[in-house]
Amino acid sequence: MTVLRSSNRQTKVQPATNFTGVVFSDEIVQGSAPSRMRASVVSFTPGGRTAWHSHPVGQTLYCLSGAGRVQFDGQQVQEIRAGDTVIIPPNTRHWHGAAPDKLFSHLAMSEQTDKGEGTAWFEHVSDTDYNAKPAPVT
């Protein structure tokens, strides 16, 4: 058994190369072979967001607190809130982050390929895309 103590975990500010605004991350687990699981709590200040990116094995987001946004390339922005789960299929270009006026945190879970490939990063999300009216919540 391995217990990863929270007191040994460091909060990291995420780089401007892949994020807009102030974004923090706490890595919860980085699996060792044969596991390929990676999980992090990511906290976004209002307006903070990822750049467009994709994951070869997909990604799952579990919303912990606040209000956020997520968008798949070519689809309408979706509002997401605490308790929501977002399942992102493999190789789907997307972004996620906080609403313009709310803090937002989620647990981000993904796996690497057996070759160690993880996140593929693309361009930053434009303010026009980010500020688009979200789809109605159903």
Indicate residue ranges for each PLM-predicted region.
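Short acidic-glycine-tyrosine-enriched beta hairpin
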Residues: 74-91
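Conserved short histidine dyad/triad with adjacent acidic residue
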Residues: 25-27, 40-55
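Glycine- and acidic-residue-biased ligand/ion/polar-headgroup-sensing regions
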Residues: 56-69, 73-74
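A short hydrophobic beta-strand segment most commonly corresponding to one strand
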Residues: 60, 87, 101-120
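Short beta-strand His + acidic residue motifs that chelate non-heme Fe in jelly-roll/DSBH
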Residues: 50-53, 70-71, 79, 93-100
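A short, N-terminal "cap"/entry segment at the start of jelly-roll beta-barrel domains
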Residues: 1-36, 118-138
